[in-house]
């Protein structure tokens, strides 16, 4: 049965890397007999220009009826002081789809080790899972001249939902290790978080659960990143730790992500921005988009062979020394994509 994939190319380099990613999806799908149909919709800045809103109703209805969503990039400096901004569309999309679990995989490729800001990056391969719908970002906010207050609020249901997602993610990986990150020595929300993690762990006897305080975890991501397999944490901590972890890769151009909703629908996107300064020049790194498509094949459609094929092709392309400018090479978007296509075996 054919799967429906809605594509949101967005702004800046978005259309270029989306095109590159879809060419890889097309080639790999033929090899694994995966059938799909694409529906392209306006989103972000281009949607503001054409429809007056970053998330038009037509786009919203399309994504709600999709089996998966691919987003390339949104944003442009011209909207920085505008009343309506592209980023508002992404926040609205997350809310409408109930996207509660953000997943960022970090893998250090041997050929790219020299790009990492730290030396000790051998065999680094882990996930950071961040809760997206609760916590201090969504609590009550008060600001006065001499006082301010932000409320960190989590329900048991919100914590339970993300922890089950994380345990299942750890269960699917060879090491089966889950590190739950909190600040339970200070925060009430973290005390509840840790209590629930220990209780839920009984349902996953094959997964080893460890606890880390957030400050300790931040240090260990630099001093011993190999110890991690799957990290799960609340919204604010996850925002900070996932960005810290991403820096280990040396370039955002190789970092994919996924965000999963209540009903199983997921959004896949690179973690980098729209890079308007290089848009249209044909030099954007398409790898994060291509790897996001690999995540889609695995997480939404169970196509492990297709996902592994893409990931191995990317690894081989790096090993062959074909690198875009952000990785220290000279390859164009087209050349990088063609090399990955060639290595899809």
Curated annotation (Swiss-Prot):
The record marks 137, 183 as: Important for catalysis. GO terms for biological process: L-leucine biosynthetic process. This is 3-isopropylmalate dehydrogenase. Its main location: cytoplasm. Catalyzes the oxidation of 3-carboxy-2-hydroxy-4-methylpentanoate (3-isopropylmalate) to 3-carboxy-4-methyl-2-oxopentanoate. The product decarboxylates to 4-methyl-2 oxopentanoate. Mg(2+) binds at residues 215, 239, 243. Substrate binds at residues 94, 104, 130, 215. Belongs to the isocitrate and isopropylmalate dehydrogenases family. LeuB type 1 subfamily. It is found in: Cytoplasm. SUPFAM superfamilies: Isocitrate/Isopropylmalate dehydrogenase-like (SSF53659). One of its GO terms (cellular component) is cytosol. Binds 1 Mg(2+) or Mn(2+) ion per subunit. One of its GO terms (molecular function) is magnesium ion binding. Its cofactor is Mg(2+); Mn(2+). Homodimer. Keywords: Amino-acid biosynthesis, Branched-chain amino acid biosynthesis, Cytoplasm, Leucine biosynthesis, Magnesium, Manganese, Metal-binding, NAD, Oxidoreductase.
